[in-house]
């Protein structure tokens, strides 16, 4: 099976606090993987390293590859980082959309990387690009909102627009950082249904950080659980049982209680 993401010996330190400890991870083509763990476990930090939004410590042997290209090595970004980012869609908890633009215009932003610079300065997009943007909106059930200002949408609708933008980008990998954290249960279900649909039908690799274990079990075939910057579990979601859940979360609660008592 083709390896899409490869992480070797990744470490990250913030202000003398080590957030990640020599993490090794391989993610394969068309997998849908959940990164789980309590707050501060390192899951979002790990995700942000995958596309080079942040760099790791200058550790000997640390290396991240995405789509066969080096993203960073020993704490330094690759010179051609834009080439690996070109086919990587990033979905944020806070949507990262331009509120003053329409839904369609926000989706067309996904085409900027493949559009000549002089046309991007004037937002001149071709008829074919606009048609692809409408098709992406159709995929996520948002085509009827194409000409509506994005600021008028609900959180769940905005998140689906962000997914459509990733489709417009022709992403081969989607990295979703807490995409349903601020959504109501129905909106969260629709967003996760949408991610699973494009994973299964388009073969797009999806890596998603989640706090909600039930969504990870329902939607993701594989779980990578982090605890205090270490990979605690990496395997099938079917094997992530109550005992592992308790060990992952209760031990953290016990540490916090002891710290307060001290």
Curated annotation (Swiss-Prot):
Keywords: ATP-binding, Cell inner membrane, Cell membrane, Membrane, Nucleotide-binding, Phosphonate transport, Translocase, Transport. InterPro entries: AAA+_ATPase, ABC_transporter-like_ATP-bd, ABC_transporter-like_CS, ABC_transpr_PhnC, MetN_ABC_transporter-like, P-loop_NTPase. Transmembrane segments: none annotated. It is an enzyme of class 7 (translocase). SMART domains: AAA. It is a peripheral membrane protein. Its EC number is 7.3.2.2. It catalyses: phosphonate(out) + ATP + H2O = phosphonate(in) + ADP + phosphate + H(+). It comes from the Bacteria. One of its GO terms (molecular function) is ATP binding. ATP binds at residues 37-44. Residues 5-253 form the ABC transporter domain. It is found in: Cell inner membrane. GO terms for cellular component: plasma membrane. Part of the ABC transporter complex PhnCDE involved in phosphonates import. Responsible for energy coupling to the transport system. Belongs to the ABC transporter superfamily. Phosphonates importer (TC 3.A.1.9.1) family. PANTHER family: AMINO ACID IMPORT ATP-BINDING PROTEIN (PTHR43166), PHOSPHONATES IMPORT ATP-BINDING PROTEIN PHNC (PTHR43166:SF6). The complex is composed of two ATP-binding proteins (PhnC), two transmembrane proteins (PhnE) and a solute-binding protein (PhnD). This is Phosphonates import ATP-binding protein PhnC. It comes from Shigella boydii serotype 4 (strain Sb227).
């Amino acid at each position: 099976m083709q390896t899409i993401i490869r992480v070797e010996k990744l470490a990250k330190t913030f202000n003398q606090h080590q957030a990640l400890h020599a993490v090794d991870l391989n993610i394969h083509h068309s997998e849908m993987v959940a990164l789980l763990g309590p707050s501060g476990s390192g899951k979002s930090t790990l995700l942000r390293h995958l596309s080079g939004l942040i760099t790791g410590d200058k550790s000997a042997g640390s290396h991240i590859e995405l789509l066969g290209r080096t993203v960073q090595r020993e704490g330094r970004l690759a010179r051609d980082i834009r080439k690996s980012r070109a086919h990587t869609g990033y979905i944020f908890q806070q949507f990262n959309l331009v509120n003053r633009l329409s839904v369609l215009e926000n989706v067309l932003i996904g085409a900027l990387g493949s559009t000549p610079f002089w046309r991007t300065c004037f937002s001149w997009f071709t008829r074919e690009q606009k048609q692809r943007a409408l098709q992406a909106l159709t995929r996520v059930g948002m085509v009827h909102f194409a000409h509506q200002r994005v600021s008028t949408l609900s959180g769940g609708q905005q998140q689906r627009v962000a997914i459509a933008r990733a489709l417009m980008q022709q992403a081969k990998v989607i990295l979703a950082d807490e995409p349903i954290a601020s959504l109501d249960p129905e909106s969260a279900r629709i967003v996760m249904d949408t991610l699973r649909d494009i994973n299964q039908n388009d073969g797009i690799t999806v890596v998603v950080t989640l706090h909600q274990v039930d969504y990870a079990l329902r939607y993701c075939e594989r779980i990578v659980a982090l605890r205090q910057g270490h990979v605690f579990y990496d395997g099938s979601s079917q094997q992530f049982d109550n005992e592992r859940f308790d060990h992952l979360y209760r031990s953290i609660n016990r540490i916090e209680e002891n710290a307060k008592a001290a």
